[in-house]
Amino acid sequence: MLSNSEIKPSENSQKTKVLLTKANNASNERAPPPLSHFIAGGVAGMLGAIATAPLDVVKTRLQSDFYKDRFLKQTAKSKSPLTAAYRHFMDTCIILKNVKVHEGTRALFRGLGPNLIGTIPARSINFFSYGNGKRILADLFNNGQENSQIHLMAAAIAGVITSAATNPIWLVKTRLQLDKKSGQAAQYRSSIDCIIKTIRLEGFRGLYKGLSASLLGVGESTLQWVLYEKFKHAVAIRQLRRKELGIQETIYDKVLDWGGKLGGAGIAKFMAAGIAYPHEVVRTRLRQSPSINGTPKYTGLIQCFKLVWMEQGIVGLYGGLTAHLLRVVPNACILFGSYEVIMHFIG
């Protein structure tokens, strides 16, 4: 005869499976209009980009090789990871202060125009592709039921589509942010001027520099989506358990549920960004303007990885990580939080 301890794990496992199925069914029953993902993603992306624009400027500068002599050598001397992280944090604060003092407050938002022009369609495309893609893939391959494999495929497809569609915009944004104005005339007068000069000097292919690194970064967005869905499922199961037990939902429960989603978005981004960060550095280096003599220092993905490694070591591949995390983690919370709120009303 089986003991209670032998039965309970099986019963709990079965109950969890039932709750997961119910959560999936509930999600499918209230499937929002396809275009709602597009609208919610674009608005959420805009809000996140505006809120974290100054840190995006700092991150881009720390990733570039223009700032390596001043900041990176000091960080490279740090043997302790905690000391290196602290130096990265101080570098972030120093650059924020210097940009404001020497270039003005508006410089903290330099590149925001093309950033918004890139972010809004990028987020719209990504959320639209992922939101509708996972539903289509679930219908095709898993009888309408979502799981981690479905989320993985949908996120990867959405990442490739988004990267290919928006690479020229990100290239312009990067070059405008690295275009220093103190002590010399600006190389680019505007986003249009940057596009014209890039095509004239480097050809149409110049607008797609860094695309290989962007495609490499699809892994980051894919991992982020999969992790976020796990956190969302945990919240959904908690809600269903309350409902089955007849427990009335309180304001505290709602706050806890929304906090779980926001926290899940932040943790998912933190983990994904930490793992995949080197591709961000390489992508920024590949998108830099050519040197004064017109010869680009970085000519390809592998060559760029090797050169950064030889010149600066592993620290070079993680230049600007602190500024990056300070930006992308709150950005992810704002992005996914805004997306969920908007979808709640229009979905």
From Swiss-Prot:
The keyword Ribosomal protein does not apply. The keyword Nucleotide-binding does not apply. The chain crosses the membrane at residues 38-58, 105-125, 152-172, 214-233, 262-282, 317-338. It catalyses: 5-methyl-UTP(out) + UTP(in) = 5-methyl-UTP(in) + UTP(out). Solcar repeats lie at residues 32-136, 146-234, 256-345. GO terms for molecular function: pyrimidine nucleotide transmembrane transporter activity. Its main location: mitochondrion. Keywords: Membrane, Mitochondrion, Mitochondrion inner membrane, Repeat, Transmembrane, Transmembrane helix, Transport. It comes from the Eukaryota. It is found in: Mitochondrion inner membrane. Mitochondrial transporter that imports/exports pyrimidine nucleotides into and from mitochondria. Selectively transports uridine, thymidine, and cytosine (deoxy)nucleoside di- and triphosphates by an antiport mechanism. Also transports, with lower efficiency, uridine, thymidine, and cytosine (deoxy)nucleoside monophosphates as well as guanosine (deoxy)nucleoside di- and triphosphate. This is Mitochondrial carrier protein rim2. The gene is rim2.
